[in-house]
Amino acid sequence: MKALPLVALLVLAAGCGSTKPPAAPAQTSSQSQTKHADAEQRAAMLMRAGDLEGAARQYGEAARIAATVENVDSVASNAINQSIVYQWLGRDAEARDALARVLDDPRRPFSERRRLQAELRRAIVDLSLQNPVSAATFAERAAQRCANLSCEYAATILNVQAQIALESSRAADAEQLAARAAERARSRNDRAEQANALRLQGKARRLQEKPKEALQPLEQALAIDRDLADPRKILADLTELSLASSAAGNRDAAKDYYERAVTVSRALRDTRGLAEMEAQLRRP
């Protein structure tokens, strides 16, 4: 799932009544909102600078301050963003724990949209933690919630379910789910999810020993991700293209895609991604 945009701060109204509110509480509330805005701005600035560690801390701080002024939407958005950044850092357990602010707190009136986003994010994190059973549970919860909304997340949910099918050795099911996801994404002009679906289609075909048929959707995914300038997705596309080319017997193409993937990974300073990619490419 993509990082969510920072939400606008809610303006808290003063209490009703004929007497003027005490100055100190009003000042405290104003200070809290200022600190909240500052934390969100610092998180965004650190993200742009590539300081993921600092951004994760600031998203957590923004969520904490939002809780003190009962800005539940901001609690959710910052917790979800913190989870995304932790996962980019390879800290999957902390990515899961960040979502507890939303998923483990039934008292706060989070919107259906925020709960769905958190459930989807948890499914993605559980996949990284190699827990496809839990991932399937949260993906199904998100799918049920999606049915109650004018749902913009249908393609994302189908892609997550396709990934779960791949992790469960059900490549044929994964290919069908990814095809449905690609169709839904195209209908909404959601190019990022369309690329995700095409990449999953390609991987599913490769795992069904159809590597030549895998190349076209993977090339389409790469073209979209290059247009979107998404380096992490480009790395995933190049890795899959190297694997599919090797399986199809085209060693020169496989080597070219591999070398390009290494270049992208090193530019990202993504040591975890580089290690995972090299491990995949060493497999027979």
Report each predicted region and the residues it spans:
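N-terminal leader/linker segments that initiate helical-solenoid repeat arrays
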Residues: 16-64, 68-77, 81
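Short coil/turn linkers that connect adjacent helices within long alpha-helical scaffolds
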Residues: 28-30, 67-71, 108-111, 147-151, ...
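Residue register of alpha-helical TPR repeats
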Residues: 37-38, 77, 117, 156-157, ...
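Eukaryotic all-alpha helical interaction scaffolds
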Residues: 59, 66-67, 86, 106-107, ...
